[in-house]
Amino acid sequence: MFLIDSHCHLDRLNYNLPLENIEDVLKKSYQNHVKNFLTVSTCISNFYNIKKLFKKYNTIFYSCGVHPLNCKKELNLFHTIENLSNEIKKLSCIKDVIALGETGLDYYYSSDTKKIQQDFFREHIRVAIKLKKPIIVHSRNASEDTIKILQEENAEKCKGVLHSFTGDYNTACKLLDLGFYISCSGIITFKNSLELCKTIRKIPLNRLLIETDSPYLSPAPYRGKGNQPAYLFYIAEYLSILKEIDIHALGHITTSNFRTLFNI
């Protein structure tokens, strides 16, 4: 079986615990059939850091972009969106950088930066279209504006994935209409995710990805503890039950979906 963690933050795992280093993390992942990883950047300095940390590992892919909660800080550093956009363009052409992001909108933690977030989100989409690379979208308490901007910026030209999806079926359908994929995280294993699971059951298998978002959102039975890519197996297992499909078949389909979207 071959599983791909389509969204993780390998640099943020807790490497201070006994026997916890990147080699141990990868070994545990391989033992759980997780064999490729997309480690996602959240700002420019973070991108440089993850590329430096993991450059010798050929199973790790990268994205380059600015998380919506980091937009204000990055604008202060780069002064203009144009300067930042040029930096993202440059870095996104580096080997093994297969996507832009994570970008998007987060109104849960920061509603006073809506305009900056929206401007950055639009610019990521425009760059992605120029570079012919997909985008990784973060959306929290902002479904309506997220869809609106994706539609207005013709994001079907670059496509992408809505990571750690928690939306309703109507939102899912609009994303699918744009050619986007929907990624399931450990949230689907939570007891209070019944409505989400009903939605996931309706989404075509050929448009689903799986992710840990580690070190966040640990799935059951590890909820409340630090997450890691090895736990993707439990997300895949739960999703296979939801979709009433053998887990090996699910692994094959989600791996194929990942390779199709990210052109690898």
Swiss-Prot record:
Binds 2 divalent metal cations per subunit. A divalent metal cation 1 binds at residues 7, 9, 102, 213. The keyword Hydrolase applies. This is Uncharacterized metal-dependent hydrolase BU355. One of its GO terms (molecular function) is DNA nuclease activity. The keyword Oxidoreductase does not apply. InterPro entries: DNase_TatD-rel_CS, Metal_Hydrolase, TatD-like, TatD/YcfH-like. GO terms for cellular component: cytosol. Belongs to the metallo-dependent hydrolases superfamily. TatD-type hydrolase family. A divalent metal cation 2 binds at residues 102, 138, 163. Coiled coil: none annotated. Its cofactor is a divalent metal cation. It comes from Buchnera aphidicola subsp. Acyrthosiphon pisum (strain APS). Its EC number is 3.1.-.-. Keywords: Hydrolase, Metal-binding.
